[in-house]
């Protein structure tokens, strides 16, 4: 279908070009007086035929270019296209009025070359400004609409915004998010950005065995989440091409959608907090449901290896919590009773420090 559309466009372009260009050629060739040749119908037919023959060579290149453009546009968010188009329109309108003013002058350079340059430059600047300032324009429109809403409507909208849970790559690979969503601890719509899916696919195609296993596990987790009827899943097909890092794209997406980033990445957690973006770290949830351990409490553990510091030993609880035991190196591969001295709690996890009792 696309091939025939391209050929029809070439036919129309060829016919138009023939009507406007061939009469001058006939005059130069000395056959302009022959009405059978020098008439609009013959010119259009010859031009259309020439351009149609060109399509047999050019159609594949035009089709490839259109497919490439379609693929690029499909990755751009609708808001980006809308604001970019508005910026382009404003730029072209300004260029139109400026060109009209310049065309009144008698200076050849100003009334011929400069208007073309102005159209190109102002159109491009308008498009770029529209894209780069789309968030500010969106916030401006939202603020104006917010003044017209009642407090009840604002609360309802704020609640609906916060229901978007945007998953990052690390939390998908981790796998625990599937169980959390299934149990209903997280409400709202789960958003899977296309750029996160692309990163997962890239990891799954890695030559490194460990990375490949992690990537495939992440894809399996996504399929499991999508098949759950109780979980609302949306794919975000937009992209932020000016931002190469996936983490930065997630932060921008959360700002645009008004959603919450769900992660277990400590660094992304801190970046979101710094930029005032709501974030849920499932490590915080995991730590919250772990049994509370207080200094002075005694427990029985199996010493499995030595620690980083001198004479330290390392043991683990059943939930995976690391216990660093002072002077515990000599008890490796032995089950001993220890006394808790302190507990270190962070978003990255929990660590218990103890000594032999």
From Swiss-Prot:
Presence of the UniProt keyword Transmembrane in the record: no
Q: Which UniProt keywords apply?
A: Hydrolase, Magnesium, Metal-binding, Nuclease
Domain TRAM: where? Answer: 292-353
Q: What is its EC number?
A: 3.1.-.-
Q: The organism sits in which domain of life?
A: Bacteria
Summarizing the function annotation, the protein's role is: An RNase.
What is this protein called in UniProt? Uncharacterized PIN and TRAM-domain containing protein Lmo0234
């Amino acid at each position: 279908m696309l091939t025939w559309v391209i050929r029809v466009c070439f036919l129309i372009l060829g016919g138009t070009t023939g009507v406007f260009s061939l009469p001058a050629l006939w005059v130069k060739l000395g056959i302009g007086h022959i009405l059978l040749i020098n008439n609009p119908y013959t010119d259009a037919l010859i031009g259309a035929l020439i351009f149609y023959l060109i399509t047999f060579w050019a159609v594949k290149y035009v089709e490839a270019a259109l497919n490439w453009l379609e693929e690029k546009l499909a990755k751009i968010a609708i808001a980006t296209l809308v604001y970019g188009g508005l910026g382009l329109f404003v730029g072209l309108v300004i260029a139109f009025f400026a060109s009209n003013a310049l065309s009144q002058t008698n200076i050849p350079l100003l009334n011929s070359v400069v208007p073309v340059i102005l159209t190109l430059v102002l159109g491009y600047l308008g498009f770029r400004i529209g894209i780069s300032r789309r968030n500010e324009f969106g916030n401006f429109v939202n603020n104006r609409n917010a003044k017209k809403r009642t407090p009840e409507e604002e609360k309802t909208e704020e609640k609906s915004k916060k229901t978007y849970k945007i998953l990052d790559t690390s939390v998908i690979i981790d796998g625990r998010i599937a169980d959390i969503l299934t149990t209903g601890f997280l409400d709202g719509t789960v958003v899977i950005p296309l750029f996160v899916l692309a990163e997962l696919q890239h990891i799954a195609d890695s030559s490194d065995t460990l990375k490949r296993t992690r990537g495939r596990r992440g894809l399996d987790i996504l399929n499991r989440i999508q098949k759950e009827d109780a979980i609302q899943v949306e794919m975000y097909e937009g992209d932020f091409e000016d931002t190469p890092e996936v983490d930065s794209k997630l932060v921008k997406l959360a700002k645009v959608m008004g959603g919450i980033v769900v992660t277990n990445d400590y660094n992304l957690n801190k970046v979101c907090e710094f930029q005032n973006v709501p974030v849920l770290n499932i490590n915080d949830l995991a730590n919250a449901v772990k049994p509370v351990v207080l200094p002075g409490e005694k427990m029985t553990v199996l010493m499995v290896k030595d620690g980083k510091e001198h004479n330290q030993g390392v043991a683990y609880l059943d939930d995976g919590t690391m216990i660093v035991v002072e002077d515990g190196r000599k008890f490796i591969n032995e089950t001993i009773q220890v006394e808790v001295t302190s507990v270190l709690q962070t978003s990255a996890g929990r660590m218990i420090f103890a000594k032999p009792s």
